[in-house]
């Protein structure tokens, strides 16, 4: 099942329209693990779900402590462009400021992350899914909430849309991504959030801890902060790609 097929919207709300093939459409159609299955840490252990998450996105995270909060968002964004074959759009800044480009990686270049970072030619051109995930692993290691927040642009709550991110850069920082949204006749929005966290773990659909009656849906009506199960975000921390 997907986010869209597993979760109904509350009475009085309708899912916002999205363009077929858009990033919003891609997020809404993320495949979920069978209901009740736990999110797994990179070491194979299960994460407790009670009060934290309701479903788990079926994502392979490997056996290293890499796929944390910002990494999950960078991966899902990169996966979107990878399946569209828009490889030149798969690039991320390291904390150092170095821009890691998948278009260079598939030409056989590799990255020396020391100092300000540099490319060096190592192998023949190749563009397999394994190549893509190897590239993303080095991104996970040298990019994070600090660099991602700087790369993104401020977004107003009025213009909030699927694919936007609440992010606080830091060590540690945190980030959650809006993966679905609905609104009522008054134009009031509700939305669904996904996250990974520390240590590396599969991406989860979060429960609303402030209003259990809402299940996995969040509303900012009357709120001054966004309260999620494992982090509180000032509302001005909303960003867009």
How should these model regions be labeled?
Residues 78, 183, 198:
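Residue-level marker of positions within ordered structural domains that often coincide
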Residues 50, 64, 176-178:
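Bimodal feature
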Residues 189-241:
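Low-complexity, Gly/Ser/Thr/Pro-rich intrinsically disordered linker/tail segments
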């Amino acid at each position: 099942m997907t986010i869209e097929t597993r979760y109904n919207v509350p009475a009085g709300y309708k899912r916002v329209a999205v363009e077929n093939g858009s990033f919003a459409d891609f997020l809404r159609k993320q495949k979920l693990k069978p209901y009740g299955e736990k999110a797994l840490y990179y070491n194979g252990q299960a994460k407790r779900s009670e009060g934290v998450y309701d479903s788990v996105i079926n994502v392979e995270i490997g056996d290293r402590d890499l796929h944390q909060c910002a990494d999950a968002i960078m991966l899902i964004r990169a996966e979107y462009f990878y399946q569209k074959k828009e490889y030149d759009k798969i690039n991320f800044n390291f904390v150092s400021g170095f821009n890691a480009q998948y278009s260079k990686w598939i030409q056989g270049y590799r990255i020396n992350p020391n100092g300000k970072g540099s490319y060096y030619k190592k192998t023949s051109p190749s563009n397999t899914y394994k190549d893509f995930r190897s590239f993303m692993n080095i991104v996970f290691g040298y990019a994070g909430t600090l660099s991602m927040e700087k790369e993104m642009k401020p977004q107003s709550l009025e213009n909030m849309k699927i694919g936007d991110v609440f992010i606080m850069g830091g060590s540690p920082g945190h980030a959650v991504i809006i993966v679905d949204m609905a609104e009522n006749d008054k134009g009031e929005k509700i939305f669904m959030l996904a996250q990974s966290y520390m240590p590396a773990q599969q991406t989860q659909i979060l429960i609303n801890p402030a209003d259990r009656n809402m299940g996995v849906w969040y509303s900012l009506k009357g709120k001054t902060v966004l309260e999620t199960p494992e982090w509180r975000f000032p509302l001005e921390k909303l960003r867009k790609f």
